[in-house]
């Protein structure tokens, strides 16, 4: 998804010819294989593909400042190799990049309130990979690597990819769950405390993660398939015991945080009550985690999914971050529809600051050809980061694509 190498546009003459042969077609821009919306269309001008600067730049996480007096545009990019400051002046073919003069293939210009620059400049100066399809008039950009929060989950059958743990900022270990009687256990059928593998113990894996700079979180799973989650939330005694047991387990086992994956609320019934009950649980849990110096993360169903029992706005005020589980839209082992993933992000952003949102990505759904596009949406919307479900499913090919896109904060 994130590609550090650059590709120059094909011969600009070819672009001009394509424009002449397909006047009825509008130029379309794809960023990380997903359409980028524009208030103004790209323009073919004297053989150069000119694009609205602000729209692409901000989608790449670049800050754009306009100086009306000097008629200059300043772009500030925090790139993987440091900060880059680019100053463009209207109607001038020379730009300044970190104070050094750089020639452009065409001078930037303003039209109907929009500043246009040569598309190739994004490749040369901002690390985006660019290509052009003459037949379809589609400009494709691949965003450069971005330093952002990276999380992964370690649960059943994850042992075979434990070598990836140090390559994430945080790993959530799914070793506990809510039972049907409303109590917490580490001996569930699907989420359980694993046995040692020779000399390698689960406690040792957690301790080694900490030593290597990865924050280990205890992940606690719950389902409402048999009403067990609702039962616990509505019973104050069960609720308080679950909170105490979760915090005690996390502290006893040397975790630095807790991530709740409480699923199934709000499919039917009193959705408002489901939200209030979960809010109450999380608020009480947050009081205990703060007192114990533990972080708190919540993995939540997306707002455009079937389960509506999650009050993103309120939950974000008490948790450290929210993970949007933007997957399982189709129920099939196939890539998630990007329109739905994008919609889930936009809905969440209406309720929660982007700095508190993490995009959950299922590596059961995605593969090495699609995962870059999903990560691209997290970058486009400038979310806190990504969370991968899960180790054991990623594979070398997908991991290589992840590494091309995301640079962990710990790096």
Identify the meaning behind each predicted range:
Residues 160-165, 309-318, 345-350, 374-377:
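Mature extracellular/periplasmic domains of secretome proteins
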Residues 171, 260, 322, 359, ...:
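Conserved, mostly hydrophobic/aromatic
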């Amino acid at each position: 998804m994130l590609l550090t190498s650059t590709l120059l546009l094909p011969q600009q003459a070819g672009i001009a010819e394509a424009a002449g042969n397909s006047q009825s077609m509008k130029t379309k821009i794809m960023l990380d294989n997903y359409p980028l919306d524009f208030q103004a269309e790209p323009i073919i001008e004297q053989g150069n593909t000119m694009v609205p600067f602000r729209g692409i730049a901000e989608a790449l996480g670049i800050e754009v400042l306009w100086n009306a007096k000097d008629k200059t545009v300043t772009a500030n990019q925090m790139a993987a190799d440091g900060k880059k400051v680019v100053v463009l002046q209207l109607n001038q073919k020379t730009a300044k990049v970190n104070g050094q003069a750089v020639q452009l293939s065409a001078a930037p210009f303003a039209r109907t309130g929009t500043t246009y620059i040569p598309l190739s400049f994004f490749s040369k100066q901002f690390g985006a990979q660019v290509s052009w399809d003459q037949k379809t008039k589609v400009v494709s950009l691949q965003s450069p690597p971005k330093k952002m929060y990276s999380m992964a989950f370690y649960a059943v059958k994850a042992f075979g990819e434990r070598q990836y743990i140090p390559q994430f900022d945080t790993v959530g270990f799914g070793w506990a769950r809510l039972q049907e009687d409303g109590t917490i256990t580490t001996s569930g059928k699907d989420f359980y405390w694993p046995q040692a593998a020779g000399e390698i113990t689960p406690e040792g894996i957690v301790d080694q993660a900490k030593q290597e700079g990865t924050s280990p979180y205890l992940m606690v799973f719950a389902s409402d398939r048999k009403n067990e989650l609702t039962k616990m939330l509505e019973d104050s005694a069960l609720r308080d015991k679950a909170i105490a047991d979760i915090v005690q387990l996390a502290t006893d086992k040397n975790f630095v945080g807790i991530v709740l994956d409480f699923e199934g609320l709000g499919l039917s019934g009193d959705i408002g009550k489901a939200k209030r009950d979960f809010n109450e649980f999380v608020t009480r849990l947050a009081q205990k985690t703060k007192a114990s110096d533990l972080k708190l993360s919540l993995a939540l169903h997306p707002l455009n999914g079937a389960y509506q029992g999650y009050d993103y706005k309120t939950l974000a005020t008490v948790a450290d971050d929210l993970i949007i589980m933007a997957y399982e839209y189709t129920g099939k082992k196939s890539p998630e529809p990007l329109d739905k993933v994008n919609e889930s992000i936009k809905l969440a952003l209406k309720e929660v600051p982007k700095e508190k949102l993490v995009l959950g990505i299922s590596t059961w759904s995605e593969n090495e050809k699609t995962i870059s596009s999903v990560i691209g949406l997290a970058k486009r919307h400038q979310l806190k980061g990504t969370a991968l479900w899960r180790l054991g499913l990623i594979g070398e090919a997908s991991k290589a694509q992840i590494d091309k896109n995301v640079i962990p904060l710990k790096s």
